[in-house]
């Protein structure tokens, strides 16, 4: 049995396949998504991880106490990066950069990078109700729609770094109880041309929605802090391309190219389950070498941030022909 996700994203398909004892492969054009998927599905020496987790927090706390007293320490953790200077308060910058510098001393560097990026997301100068698509930094107190009161801009990262470091350890421990020895492979590549093994039994994926999200821009805090390579020019259907007729044509060509390529590696009669928001009716199974044998509609009511209107998804069930 082999499951494939050509739009691996944060690795949900890979995690669930492993828990079920099924070998899986994921591909994503975003190196941040690849890093996240690898961290979620990696094997860990739990006692060593626990030791490293508490050690980095202890060292961060020691440096944190010197920030207001020692100018040499302050200079160690400064940056000329315009994005970091714009979107993080001065003290937040120091704490994030300190944690970042300490990561190189540990075995599980990729996991600590994910903790850093997760903390950075929460520690930005943004409103609590607009973590997904902030347009400008929030530097003054504001009326918070999420908490129904006035809230202050975030001025520290330490509370997030501490909370998420421990939380990540807890998540790894929890997943280790059900993790199997099933293989997980994560490719950093374009799904339209990536080389795959023959005999894929099932594709389970959720392609990007047309004109909704600029996926690299959405995680820019991670790209800037971790120095990751940006591949946004290879994204399919990014928000900046809009939802014009031309954008729709480009989008569905990109999607069909992915499935036509993937199809070559699939077993006879193999299934593809595709979660989409197909309000424009762009998905035609026959154009990608499949036939549609079923469709399930679902209302999505668990989302971060404030978004207008009801949101629906379809689960397309396609079979290779």
Region spans (language model):
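Conserved proline-anchored active-site loop of SAM-dependent methyltransferases
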Residues: 3-20, 24-31, 37, 112, ...
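Conserved beta-strand segments of alpha/beta enzyme cores
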Residues: 23, 183-185, 291
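Conserved phosphoryl-transfer catalytic core
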Residues: 32-102, 227-241
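Short amphipathic alpha-helical segments
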Residues: 38-39, 101, 215-218, 285-286
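SAM-dependent nucleic-acid methyltransferase catalytic core
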Residues: 91-204, 210-213
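Conserved Class I SAM-dependent methyltransferase catalytic core
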Residues: 99, 109, 240-295
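SAM-dependent methyltransferase catalytic-core segment centered on the flexible catalytic loop
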Residues: 197-202, 208-268
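Class I S-adenosyl-L-methionine
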Residues: 277-321
């Amino acid at each position: 049995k082999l499951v494939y996700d050509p739009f691996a994203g944060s690795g949900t398909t890979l995690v669930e396949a492993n828990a079920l004892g099924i070998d899986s492969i994921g591909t994503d054009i975003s190196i941040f998504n690849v890093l996240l998927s690898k961290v979620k599905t990696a094997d860990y020496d739990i006692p060593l991880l626990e030791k490293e987790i508490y050690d980095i927090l202890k060292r961060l706390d020691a440096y944190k106490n010197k920030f207001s007293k020692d100018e040499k320490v302050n200079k160690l953790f400064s940056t000329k990066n315009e994005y970091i200077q714009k979107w993080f308060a001065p003290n937040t910058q120091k704490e994030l950069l300190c944690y970042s510098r300490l990561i190189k001393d540990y075995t599980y560097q990729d996991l600590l990078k994910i903790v850093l990026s997760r903390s950075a997301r929460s520690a930005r100068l943004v409103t609590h109700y607009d973590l997904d698509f902030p347009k400008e930094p929030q530097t003054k107190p504001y009326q918070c729609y999420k908490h129904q009161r006035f809230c202050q801009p975030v001025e520290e990262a330490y509370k997030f770094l501490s909370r998420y470091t421990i939380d990540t350890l807890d998540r790894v421990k929890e997943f280790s109880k059900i993790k199997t020895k099933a293989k997980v492979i994560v490719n950093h590549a374009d799904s339209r041309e990536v080389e795959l093994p023959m005999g894929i039994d099932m594709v389970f994926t959720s392609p990007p929605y047309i004109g909704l999200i600029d996926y690299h821009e959405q995680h820019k805090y991670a790209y800037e802090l971790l120095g990751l390579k940006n591949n946004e020019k290879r994204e399919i259907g990014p928000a900046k391309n809009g939802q014009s007729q031309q954008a729709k044509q480009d989008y569905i060509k990109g999607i069909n190219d992915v499935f036509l390529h993937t199809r070559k590696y699939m077993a006879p009669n193999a299934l593809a389950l595709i979660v989409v928001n197909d309000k424009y009716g762009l998905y035609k199974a026959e154009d990608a070498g499949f036939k549609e044998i079923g469709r399930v509609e679902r209302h999505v009511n668990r989302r971060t941030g404030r978004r207008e209107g009801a949101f629906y998804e379809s689960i397309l069930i396609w079979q290779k022909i």
